[in-house]
């Protein structure tokens, strides 16, 4: 298999704005409730990091109205779009697994369907880093896998666009989180097609 991260980066680069168009056609309001929930637990002007921000819609656009927002994504094309879509926010092209921040840098971290694009072996270390980057009483909101699966799709969203995913089951994610030190504030299944994902809201 080609480098999984290269597959992800090239896939999102190839799709460009068509990635957002596809999901807006499916459900244009899919993130509204969870973004409101995230804002409600954060203090005004909180420092927030998004892992896998894509084109900045809707998360960066929404959060940057209320908090000091920073987004990272592996796709340069998506980051260019994000800078246009949320001009008051700060963005960086980066591999989320290679990020380095001082401890206690953020009040909140959000990752919607993004960490599951990392190889599974790299995910526990990223969650440990996220815990360290959070300030006391900080929050991590993430949507991860519901079942164990690693694979690719060579025709994702449109013909010829490749994509890679890797995730474990929800109980294993929860075990990781509690071992790291997170408190589980909320967990629920997010249906999608014939399967779905798992929402977690965690507190340090």
Q: Where are each of the predicted segments found?
A:
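Conserved class I S-adenosyl-L-methionine
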Residues: 1-43, 191
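Class I SAM-dependent methyltransferase SAM/SAH-binding core
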Residues: 49, 54-98
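A short acidic, Gly/Pro-enriched loop at the edge of an enzyme's catalytic core
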Residues: 97-109
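A short glycine-rich, Lys/Arg-flanked "PGG" loop and its adjoining helix->strand segment in the class I
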Residues: 124-136
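Conserved beta-strand signature within the Rossmann-like core of class I S-adenosyl-L-methionine
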Residues: 138-144
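Short, glycine-/aromatic-enriched active-site segment of Class I SAM-dependent methyltransferases
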Residues: 145-164
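Short alpha-helix
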Residues: 165-180
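Core SAM-dependent methyltransferase catalytic element
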Residues: 180, 189-204
């Amino acid at each position: 298999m080609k480098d999984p991260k290269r597959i992800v980066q090239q896939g999102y680069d190839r799709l460009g704005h068509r990635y957002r168009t596809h999901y807006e056609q499916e459900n244009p309001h899919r993130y509204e409730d969870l973004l409101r929930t995230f804002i409600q637990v954060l203090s005004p002007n909180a420092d927030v990091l998004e892992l896998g921000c894509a084109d900045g819609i809707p998360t960066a656009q929404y959060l940057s109205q209320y908090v000091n927002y920073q987004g990272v994504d592996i796709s340069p094309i998506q980051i260019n779009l994000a800078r246009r879509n949320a001009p008051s926010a700060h963005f960086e092209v980066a591999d989320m697994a290679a990020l380095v921040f001082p401890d206690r840098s953020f009040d909140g971290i959000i990752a919607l369907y993004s960490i599951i694009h990392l190889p599974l072996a790299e995910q526990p270390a990223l969650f440990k880093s996220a815990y360290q980057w959070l300030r006391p009483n900080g929050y991590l909101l993430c949507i991860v896998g519901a079942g164990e699966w690693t694979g690719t799709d060579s025709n994702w969203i449109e013909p010829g666009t490749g994509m890679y995913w890797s995730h474990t089951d929800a109980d294993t994610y929860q075990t990781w989180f509690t071992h790291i030190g997170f408190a589980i504030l909320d967990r629920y299944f997010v249906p999608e097609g014939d399967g779905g994902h798992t929402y977690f809201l965690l507190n340090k």
